[in-house]
Regions:
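Modules that initiate DNA replication and primer synthesis
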Residues: 1-44, 79-114, 118
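Feature primarily recognizes SF3-like P-loop helicase cores of small DNA viruses
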Residues: 41-77, 110, 114-425
Length: 425
């Protein structure tokens, strides 16, 4: 790509060059073994759709609506929201798209009734009357409500983005098992997408930035790239939490901001309360945890000095067990953690525990440089993003873009891995 741009997979490409082996992905429904022939994406909705006049009332209207918009609209149980297929992806109906669709269905019913009237006056008059009734707001609402139960018109919230081996990107979907770019399909149920395209291109400006932040330390650069690659996979096999530590003007904010923009819909920014120690009797709602469902990158920015970590929360967030949490005034929901938490802070947090369960999860990434005077570029982030549009690329080995610490866990002697001796002293 021109100007050394990175579209999302440079992160993966460089991680691969650090070496890895493919992980033992669990099988999920909808994961294609290779690249199967993709069914055609839904085309434009026809203004005419035949009506089964042998059926009656709201049930007929709902089935007519479902027939028109099968593969184009989905109701999400749990969210109580509709999704619509927009060009090449599912998006939430946040501008009344489902209302517009049910109005189109009512109009199509009138078109069919008018054709009946032209062919048979007696039969057509009754159908015109029913089509007119279908245009009322009460009938439109009833149509939408009953359509939720029609086959293929709804899914559970947990069904969305449920396959961690599929990664939505700007120009399709990447099968992380093979590094193959595929066209997005409605049946993949992908609603999240990275902030840039998949492409294969070198990324010299990003590599230069990494060399400036970690000068002369290729081992750390390689480890960071593996960490970034691992984060994109949605795996929780390593049970790690990354702490980017160092005082200001050292590149860590730019590093983190670019990471958030790259991961796009898979990224969440959480408040420091996510990790702050709480009273043992504090059972209040944890919206800061509930909001993380479906994320792959969770960023926590700037812990207060002297903050003690909530060690049970760290173990849960950097663990493999399902997490239960709720928003205020909402019921609990349970989900599997598919994210890696990255913390940016000037101060090392306080960890009072001495057990391996907490310390083996901590990965410390030190930012030791300080860029001052002529070394500081206030436009660097814009340059990195504008000229380095990240991509998910694969090298000549065509292996899955999964970071490897060893097999796909921490390598022995990895400079980013916290150890009981070096970090507890």
């Amino acid at each position: 790509m021109a100007n050394g741009q990175i579209t999302i997979g440079s992160l993966i490409d460089i991680a691969q060059k650090g070496g890895w082996s493919a992980p033992p992905w669990k099988q999920h429904a909808g994961l294609p073994p290779g690249v199967p022939p993709a069914p055609p994406a839904p085309g434009p909705v026809s203004a005419y759709h035949p009506v089964d006049w042998a059926m009656h009332g709201d049930i007929r209207n709902a089935r007519h609506f479902a027939g028109m918009f099968d593969g184009r609209l989905l109701y999400i149980h749990g969210l109580k929201r509709w999704l619509c297929w927009s060009d090449d992806r599912w998006v939430l109906c946040d501008q009344g798209q489902e209302i517009e669709a049910v109005k189109q269905a009512a109009h199509a019913m009138m078109t069919d009734a008018a054709a009946s009237l032209a062919a048979d006056q007696d039969r057509g008059k009754g159908r015109i009357k029913e089509a007119v009734a279908a245009h009322s707001i009460s009938r439109l609402k009833a149509t939408l409500e009953l359509a939720q139960s029609e086959p293929g018109m709804s899914v559970g919230h947990a069904d969305l983005d449920s396959n961690p081996a599929l990664l939505g990107v700007g120009n399709g979907v990447v099968d992380l098992k093979t590094g193959t770019l595929m066209a997005n399909r409605p049946d993949m149920l992908i609603t999240r997408h990275c902030g840039a395209d998949y492409d294969i291109a070198p990324c010299p400006r990003w590599l230069q930035f990494m060399a400036e932040v970690f000068p002369g330390d290729q081992a750390t650069i390689d480890a960071v790239q593996r960490l970034l690659g691992y984060t994109l996979t949605g795996l929780n096999t390593e049970e790690i939490m990354v702490f980017c530590i160092g005082f200001g003007a050292n590149g860590k904010s730019i590093f983190g901001n670019i990471g958030n923009r790259i991961t796009g819909g898979y990224s969440k920014v959480a408040p420091h309360s996510l990790l702050a120690a709480r009273r043992g009797d504090d059972h209040s709602a944890r919206g800061d945890i509930a909001m993380l469902e479906g994320a792959r990158l969770v960023s926590v920015n700037e812990l207060p000095g002297g903050m003690q970590l909530d060690e049970p929360a760290v173990k849960a967030l950097a663990g493999r067990e399902p997490i239960s949490a709720r928003h205020l005034y909402a019921d609990f929901s349970t989900f599997d953690p598919r994210f890696t938490v990255w913390v940016r802070t000037n101060h090392r947090p306080i960890i009072k525990g001495d057990d391996d369960g907490i310390w083996r999860r901590i990965v410390v990434l030190p930012f030791r440089q300080k860029f001052e005077g002529a070394q500081r570029d206030p436009h660097l982030e814009a340059k990195l993003w504008g000229r380095t549009r990240w991509h998910l690329a694969v090298d000549d080995r065509r292996r899955a873009p999964v970071s490897r610490f060893g097999k796909f866990g921490p390598q022995s002697g990895d400079p980013c891995r916290a150890t009981p001796v070096s970090e507890r002293e």
